[in-house]
From Swiss-Prot:
Location in the cell: Cytoplasm, Cytoskeleton; Cytoplasm, Cytoskeleton, Microtubule organizing center, Centrosome
LRR repeat ranges, renumbered to this chain: 30-51, 52-71, 72-93, 94-115, 116-137, 146-167, 168-189
Name of the protein described by the UniProt record: Protein phosphatase 1 regulatory subunit 42
Molecular functions (GO terms): actin binding; dynein complex binding; tubulin binding
Organism, scientific name: Xenopus laevis
UniProt-listed InterPro entries: Leu-rich_rpt, Leu-rich_rpt_4, LRR_dom_sf, SDS22/Internalin_LRR
Keywords, comma-separated and alphabetical: Cytoplasm, Cytoskeleton, Leucine-rich repeat, Repeat
Domain LRRCT: 203-241
Amino acid sequence: MVRLTVDLVMKNSNVLRNRKDESLARHLRRITHLNFSNKNIDEVEDLTMCRNLTVLYLYDNNINQIKNLGSNLTHLYLQNNCISCIENLSGLKRLEKLYLGGNCLTVVEGLEGLRELRELHIENQRLPPGEKLLFDPRTLHFLGISLSVLNISNNNIDELKDLAVLENLTQFVAADNQLKEIKDLEFVLSKWTKLCRMDLSGNPVCLKPKYREKVTIISKTLEILDGKEIKEMARQFLLNWKASRISKKKKNLENMTGPSLLPQLYESDNYRSLLPVYNQNFRHQLLEQPKYIVMAHTQSCNKHGQLQRSAGKRNISVIEDIKSEARGMESFSGCIPESECVGGQHGNERPGYPTNLINLWKGEKDETEGIP
């Protein structure tokens, strides 16, 4: 057992006394850096006399509790010890870098007072089998103000949504975890608008088709992904390619629905609300088929409820397929312009729906039969 005491500091300090009669307190105040790595230290005694100590190396020891540290520390290295709880750090108001990798932490907590903390390294925790590293929401909230570098590699982490509050991150390392979903990345990357470097190597998500291309498009600021540089020319190519695909889909959709409803259908995040309201089972089945086929039919209705010839047999055959599902439907509300519909005050049908389409859903004779 080795304790880090003031006497041990004096013996190992590189700062020499100016005079033989220099007091101990004065000498300790002149020490700014201490390196006691790999010294079999298991306990730290009071170092508050080292008032100007800013950098302390205590990695590769047997320390199991964080305590008795100087209040002016800016860099603290505690990797590869036996620490199971983050505690007694609230007084370190100037701490900028904290290294806690290779310990026994299960929860990241107790960092609420560290408003100057820029880097947090907590990789490779010795976790119980089947458990993952957790994050205290209160700690994350406070870290979101200042933290720019976070390393959480090899901690069985399977989602990142709780980390979205860390909006000032510029470097993020989460290699060798259990991240699987691109959507999870998409959410946090939309919040991390300052991110320049990210390493997710060794995660299942890296095996997803077009993983690198998708991440490159999602994050406009990312410069290095999994150790490889992202060329701006490559990102621009992917963005242009995506825009081209969207434009092509938009044109295809316009051909199916007609131009009047296209902006609502295509730009809405909740296109389902723009579709007619069917009974639940029928609505589900319709969404499994081409989503706008009924809209294509209704858009083709003129003021008299007659189907224009441009609709063609394609729409008729589709409606024949869904006729049996539509019978008995009690409610239907759609996004059909009034100028294209009949009924309401001038007829017996429900307002805002083309006559021939309502008759078709009721199982009556299809007025569109015979149209080439």
